[in-house]
């Protein structure tokens, strides 16, 4: 695929979710109020910084898969090993966040009326982190194979879901 086509898919992968996320965040902010929206954005930051538990493996997968193109056994080995390593490190993140969710809520000085919901939300966040980190490894496979069209279609969908699902959840709750 040409550089222009790959650039188009990369741009689309970031632009489409952004177009949906900006108004969705405005609505969520109005519905939640200042403190709850602050907690909500903190969770997005935690997901963003969760890449620390990736240990740089996703970047290594991109390079290794690109080098091993055509060697199916080598690619399977790379994906298997990286999946196991990231699953183990993300399990550590899950245990830390789930184990200290009430401590985190107290440390953040969250108002008493939001503490129970916030502790539950931290538990849900903890369970989703392994999925986020594993998807990063598997997206890296597509990037290493230079399958930018499929990669960015998936990124676009996941970005849209990250904007729309919280909006639906807040609207229903």
Model segments located where?
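Transmembrane-helix boundary and interhelical linker motifs in polytopic inner-membrane proteins
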Residues: 1, 32, 50-85, 105-110, ...
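N-terminal membrane topogenesis motif
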Residues: 1-21, 73-84, 115-119, 146
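Signature of the first transmembrane helix
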Residues: 2-63, 90, 94-98, 128, ...
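Hydrophobic transmembrane helix module of multi-pass membrane transport proteins
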Residues: 16, 85-173
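Residues at alpha-helix boundaries and short interhelical turns
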Residues: 31, 36, 69-72, 90, ...
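Residue-level recognition of membrane-helix boundary sites in multi-pass small-molecule transporters
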Residues: 36-39, 81, 120, 150
């Amino acid at each position: 695929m040409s550089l222009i086509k790959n650039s188009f898919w990369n741009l689309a992968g970031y632009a489409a979710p952004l177009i949906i996320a900006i108004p969705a965040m405005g609505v969520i902010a109005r519905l939640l109020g200042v403190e709850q929206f602050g907690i909500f954005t903190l969770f997005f930051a935690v997901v963003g910084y969760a890449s620390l538990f990736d240990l740089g493996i996703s970047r290594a997968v991109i390079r290794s898969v690109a080098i091993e193109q055509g060697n199916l056994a080598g690619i399977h080995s790379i994906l298997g090993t990286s999946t196991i390593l990231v699953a183990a490190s993300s399990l550590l993140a899950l245990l830390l966040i789930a184990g200290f969710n009430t401590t985190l809520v107290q440390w953040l000085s969250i108002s008493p009326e939001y503490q129970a919901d916030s502790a539950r939300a931290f538990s849900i966040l903890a369970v989703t982190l392994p999925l986020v980190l594993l998807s990063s490894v598997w997206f890296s496979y597509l990037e290493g194979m230079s399958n930018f069209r499929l990669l960015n279609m998936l990124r676009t969908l996941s970005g849209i879901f990250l904007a729309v699902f919280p909006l639906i959840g807040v609207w229903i709750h």
